[in-house]
């Protein structure tokens, strides 16, 4: 299985998915065509064949369409029988309660994923 890498843009996040189970989504997610952007990520997640997955999500902004596709991808990872341990590291800015709440909502909707919350302060 090949790694999956997308350079970030002003409207799409950095994606760095390694076949060894280290996954990263970082930046802003408001693509013009959310289905076109997230479909390769979801398909890749469905084919992943590792026992431990560590997904770091560090999104400074995500629109509602992106949130729906993220949930779809999380559910695919959660249902992937090859994965025995799914850890989602949810990074959020200290004063961004909405971002924290988004992670908590995702966590409630998944069966097996272990969410770990990481608060950070924006550098001055």
Regions found by a protein language model. Name each.
Residues 14-15, 81-89, 113-124:
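Short flexible/disordered coil segments
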Residues 45:
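Extended lipid/amphipathic-ligand handling interfaces
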Residues 2-39:
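STAS-typified acidic loop motif
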Residues 96-124:
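A generic hydrophobic-segment detector
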Residues 22, 53-54:
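Structural motif
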Residues 36, 40-42, 54-107:
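Amphipathic alpha-helical interaction surfaces in cytosolic regulatory modules
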């Amino acid at each position: 299985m090949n790694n999956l890498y997308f350079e970030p843009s002003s409207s799409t996040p950095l994606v760095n998915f390694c076949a060894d189970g280290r996954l990263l989504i970082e930046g802003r997610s408001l693509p013009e065509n959310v289905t076109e952007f997230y479909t390769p990520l979801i398909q890749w997640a469905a084919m992943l064949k590792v026992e431990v997955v560590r997904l770091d999500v560090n999104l400074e902004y995500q629109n509602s369409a992106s949130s729906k596709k993220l949930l779809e991808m999380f559910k695919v990872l959660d249902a992937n029988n090859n994965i025995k341990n799914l850890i989602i590291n949810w990074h959020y800015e200290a004063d961004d309660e909405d971002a924290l709440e988004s992670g908590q909502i995702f966590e409630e909707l998944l069966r097996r994923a272990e969410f770990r919350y990481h608060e950070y302060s924006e550098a001055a």
